[in-house]
Amino acid sequence: MTTLRAFTCDDLFKFNNINLDPLTETYGIPFYLQYLAHWPEYFIVAEAPGGELMGYIMGKAEGSVAREEWHGHVTALSVAPEFRRLGLAAKLMEMLEEISERKGGFFVDLFVRVSNQVAVNMYKQLGYSVYRTVIEYYSASNGEPDEDAYDMRKALSRDTEKKSIIPLPHPVRPEDIE
């Protein structure tokens, strides 16, 4: 039976099998520790019965309440290749959405590579829609051009009029993101 639990510092030494995917953004240990210290409830791991890590989600709460922009943000979601197509990503997303609801968020958002159609389709099936395109959001490392991202959003119950998911008509640049 899969266990969904809070991510711990010890998990930093056990999740390399998940981060080997070329579409998974990886960060230095201080970055993960910052999230663990500031937003521990948004950092969740899926663990197999034998203790092997199957996947994780890392996020945060951010934005302005006054401007109805307080929201949950998915910084990273990844499932190890051998545990894909089991519904783990959907379950992890559901947990982050529930936490964001409890925190009074208007929506949940995330960024995904335009080329990652498997992920884009999964997010659409989970109720997310493309809010805007962010030009050259992802830096290329091998001489390839930088890649655009979709900023995808799902309105939560606090956004009764669904204003947070009305798509922007034009793409934006990374420096224009608040």
UniProtKB/Swiss-Prot annotation:
This is N-alpha-acetyltransferase 20. Its main location: cytoplasm. InterPro entries: Acyl_CoA_acyltransferase, GNAT_dom, NatB_acetyltransferase_subunit. Residues 2-157 form the N-acetyltransferase domain. The keyword Acyltransferase applies. Gene3D superfamilies: 3.40.630.30. Pfam families: Acetyltransf_1. Its EC number is 2.3.1.254. GO terms for molecular function: protein N-terminal-methionine acetyltransferase activity; protein-N-terminal amino-acid acetyltransferase activity. Component of the N-terminal acetyltransferase B (NatB) complex which is composed of naa20 and naa25. Keywords: Acyltransferase, Cytoplasm, Nucleus, Transferase.
